[in-house]
């Protein structure tokens, strides 16, 4: 090891770095965080800061770089965003009171999900850490947003359920046991994508150890007191313990705002697998993963960041119990029908900051004076909101109003203790309000008076000495001093004590000046210490009431969501759906919420839908591409989901029989990374639907079988439709769109299947898609007309018409379609078979011309082929 690394400071650095080899170490050195060696090389490149070195131009050069400690957060955020962990190492002793090397230690490790500073968080999104573990078939999940204190856990009976949870939570960081991290199942890896993955040692998955962590954090005697049954929810218990262990390793501090653990039972919510969430674009679009253009973007008119996050959670976890859905609908209805109340509520909510995250920072001792002031200003809105809701009649509105705690004691404390416009840094001074503490007020008076005395002394000394340029100044090295220029040195009095020679003159002190310096500086030092102590006391007293703040924040967030849904319903003429436990799903004049809201320059054509377990169990939808089949099917799924969220829906009337699951299969891309083609993905997703769907499910299938040959695809689509209709455990309410027109024949043999098609008008060799869903089956696909609309070259369109005409008329030469304009038939061989064909050629040709292939069933085609073979 080089001698440069043998200094006491560098030895200390290397010891601490060895404990955090996977992190970039921010090593506190006075007013800077410094990075050394490889960390410096990485950080300087990513942060675009100067890389320098200790022992420059020697064989023992040590690369290093640094950032100011008071502005380190943006730099930490950039490193975390780039995929690095950052270990923050602080001086844990006061350098002024320490001889020799200052003690240092890591106080926290910042990872993607352990960021709590507001600048590094997306306001309208949770920042979840999700832990996953398994024991055989069962999986445990626990997820925590450290910035808000939301902590949830769940068990899943299978891998598909774990993938569904992962998709719905969309964590910023995954936490896995070592073995699972090395061998993550493909189903989870696909959903996890490129999210950062942290690991805990496999030994952490010990029930006794995890139970101890849980009991310690939540102050209970056993996990069962939180509802975590050791047998029934053992995997959830282990996942929860993983999260707490990870926090213990990386935060090095108590987390009092983690007060509650919510157990999520999957049968309490509408199940939406990853493919369905993606296909319905619930919270982000498929094309660019943006909120705009998604259902969330369409419905989000919330006034607070808390409300925006809560709306996203509601959309991710729709309800399946009628009573709570109706409570939400009644609340939305009252706010919709009372615009004055809605406006007043929204106006007050605009004055509410992110209470959940403010409360988190206060509890973790990370809040500054401005945070406490923001907390105060937010709580100031609560009495007005309670007053506005006094006359509310909807049970949910009344219950939420009761949850609103004005926290008058905390508001008064902050208002009295914290200055109206506190500085950013706690050490700048001026954070405590005048009049709050008698000793502090006295010290401030001394400081102000002392500074005034210094100013008066400067004027007096100028008069006494006749030196008009004499100045009294201050720096940290010499304290207060008198500065005299060279030209006036002959006028310096005898009582001046010289302290320093500078280029422009001399610096002096006097006994009187030093006496006042001690008084003033002593007061200022004491002011800083006292202010910091008082602020900590105020912050701790506020943190002690964090539970009350948390409940109020949750109620405000729910009110914000209800007001947002009411506003959207009012502006877009949505109706209140009737939600029940029946099997009927009936939508009158339904519209697609997102497509309608985007207002693409044309009126959205509404359509009716009826699904039940009798004559309308499976709707077989045929029709041309671009006619609106996919939009129609998605809108039915979205309207169902919106109703179960508790939202009004885009229709003139709707009755929604609760769905336990929604499945969609509406297209896939090649998954080359897993060696799976479009068709393989399509078949896997369809198989999952057939295994999982129940009579209470809603299934949306679009163009099953299109990824393989025509006969294979038709056969698979036919069998899937029969299975969904005939299999008792899987008789799901189904929308089945297909380009195989032969499937329309199923309606003749199965009473639960109804044929629907999209109305089309042909005019002057043009096709007009009317977007209206009508009873019946399509006879044409209008593919060439769609190609024309897509801008295909004219000569390609004309040639396609010729080929289509040839195929439809069944014109054959030598037993093959005559597709080549200039083809010349090869010489015919004289065989008995040829002679036989020639003798019956006219009869066969006439028979083939009359065929209408587009309406033949597979069985009819096979029978005809057998007949023609016998004729030949």
UniProtKB/Swiss-Prot annotation:
ATP binds at residues 623-630. Keywords: ATP-binding, DNA damage, DNA repair, DNA-binding, Nucleotide-binding. One of its GO terms (biological process) is mismatch repair. Pfam families: MutS_I, MutS_II, MutS_III, MutS_IV, MutS_V. GO terms for cellular component: cytosol. One of its GO terms (molecular function) is ATP binding. This protein is involved in the repair of mismatches in DNA. It is possible that it carries out the mismatch recognition step. This protein has a weak ATPase activity. Belongs to the DNA mismatch repair MutS family. NCBIfam families: mutS1, PRK05399.1. This is DNA mismatch repair protein MutS.
């Amino acid at each position: 090891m080089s001698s440069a690394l043998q200094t006491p400071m560098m030895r200390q650095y290397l010891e601490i770095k060895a404990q955090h080899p996977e992190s970039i170490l921010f090593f506190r050195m006075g007013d800077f965080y410094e990075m050394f060696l490889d960390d410096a090389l990485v950080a300087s490149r990513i942060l675009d800061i100067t890389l320098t070195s200790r022992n420059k131009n020697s064989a023992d050069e040590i690369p290093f770089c640094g950032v100011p400690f008071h502005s380190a957060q943006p730099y930490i955020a950039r490193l975390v965003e780039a995929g690095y962990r950052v270990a923050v190492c602080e001086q844990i002793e006061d350098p002024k009171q320490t001889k020799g090397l200052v003690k240092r230690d890591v106080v926290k490790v910042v990872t993607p999900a352990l960021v709590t500073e507001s600048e590094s968080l997306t306001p309208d999104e949770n920042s979840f850490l999700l832990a996953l573990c398994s024991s055989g078939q069962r999986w445990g999940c626990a997820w925590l947003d450290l910035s808000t204190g939301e902590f949830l856990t769940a068990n899943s009976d299978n891998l598909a359920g774990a993938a569904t949870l992962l998709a719905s939570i969309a964590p910023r960081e995954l936490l896995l046991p070592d073995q699972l991290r090395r061998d993550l199942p493909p189903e989870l890896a696909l959903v996890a994508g490129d999210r950062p993955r942290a690991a805990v040692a496999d030994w952490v998955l010990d029930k006794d150890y995890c139970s101890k962590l849980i009991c310690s954090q939540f102050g209970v005697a056993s996990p069962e007191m939180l509802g975590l049954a050791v047998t029934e929810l053992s995997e959830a218990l282990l996942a929860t313990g993983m999260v707490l262990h990870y926090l213990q390793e990386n935060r090095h501090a108590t987390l009092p705002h983690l007060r509650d653990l919510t157990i999520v039972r999957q049968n309490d919510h509408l199940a939406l697998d990853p493919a369905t969430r993606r296909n319905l674009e619930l919270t982000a679009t498929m094309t660019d993963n943006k909120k705009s253009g998604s259902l969330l973007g369409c419905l989000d008119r919330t006034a607070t960041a808390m409300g925006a996050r809560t709306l996203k959670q509601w959309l991710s976890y729709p309800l399946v119990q009628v009573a709570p859905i109706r409570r939400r609908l009644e609340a939305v209805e009252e706010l919709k029908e009372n615009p004055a109340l809605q406006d007043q509520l929204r106006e007050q909510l605009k004055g509410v900051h992110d209470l959940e995250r403010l409360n988190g920072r206060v509890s973790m001792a990370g809040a500054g004076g401005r945070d406490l002031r923001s907390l105060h200003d937010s709580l100031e809105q609560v009495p007005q909101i309670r007053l506005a809701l006094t006359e509310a009649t909807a049970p949910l509105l009344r219950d939420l109003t009761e949850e609103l705690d004005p926290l008058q004691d905390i508001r008064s404390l902050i208002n009295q203790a914290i200055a109206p416009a506190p500085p950013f840094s706690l050490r700048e001074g001026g954070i405590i309000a005048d009049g709050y503490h008698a000793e502090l007020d006295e010290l401030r008076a001394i400081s102000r008076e002392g500074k005034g005395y210094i100013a008066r002394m400067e004027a007096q000394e100028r008069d006494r000495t006749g030196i008009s340029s004499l100045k009294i100044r201050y720096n940290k090295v010499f304290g207060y001093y008198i500065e005299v220029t060279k030209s006036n040195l002959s006028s310096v009095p005898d009582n001046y004590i010289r302290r320093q020679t500078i280029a422009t003159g001399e610096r002096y002190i006097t006994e009187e000046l030093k006496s006042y310096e001690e008084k003033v500086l002593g007061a200022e030092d004491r002011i800083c210490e006292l202010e910091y102590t008082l602020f900590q006391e105020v912050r701790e007293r506020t943190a002690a009431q964090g539970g009350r703040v948390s409940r109020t924040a949750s109620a405000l967030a729910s009110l914000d969501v209800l007001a947002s849904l009411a506003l959207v319903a009012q502006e877009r003429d949505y109706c209140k759906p009737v939600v029940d436990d029946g099997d009927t799903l009936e939508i009158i004049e339904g519209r697609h919420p997102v497509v309608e809201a985007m207002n693409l320059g044309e009126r959205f054509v509404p359509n009716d839908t009826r699904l039940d377990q009798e004559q309308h169990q499976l709707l077989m939808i045929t029709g041309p591409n671009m006619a609106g089949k996919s939009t129609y099917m998605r809108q039915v799924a979205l309207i169902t989901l919106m109703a179960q969220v508790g939202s009004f829906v885009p229709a003139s009337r709707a009755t929604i029989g609760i769905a336990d699951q929604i499945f969609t299969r509406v297209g896939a891309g090649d998954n080359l990374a897993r060696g799976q083609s479009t068709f393989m993905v399509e078949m896997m997703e369809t198989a999952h639907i057939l295994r999982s769907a129940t009579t209470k499910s809603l299934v949306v299938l679009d163009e099953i079988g299109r990824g393989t040959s025509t006969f294979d695809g038709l056969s698979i689509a036919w069998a899937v439709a029969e299975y969904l209709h005939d299999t008792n455990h899987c008789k799901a309410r189904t929308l089945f769109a297909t380009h195989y027109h032969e499937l329309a024949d199923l309606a003749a043999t199965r009473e639960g299947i109804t044929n629907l098609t999209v109305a089309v008008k042909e005019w002057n060799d043009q096709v007009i898609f009317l977007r209206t869903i009508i009873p019946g089956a399509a006879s044409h696909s209008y593919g060439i007309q769609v190609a024309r609309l897509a801008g295909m070259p004219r000569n390609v369109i004309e040639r396609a018409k010729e080929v289509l005409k040839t195929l439809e008329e069944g014109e054959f030469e030598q037993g093959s379609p005559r597709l080549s304009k200039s083809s010349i038939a090869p010489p015919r061989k004289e065989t008995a078979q040829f002679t036989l064909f020639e003798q019956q050629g006219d009869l066969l040709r006439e028979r083939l011309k009359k065929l209408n292939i587009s309406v033949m069933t597979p069985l009819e085609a096979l029978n005809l082929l057998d007949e023609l073979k016998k004729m030949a």
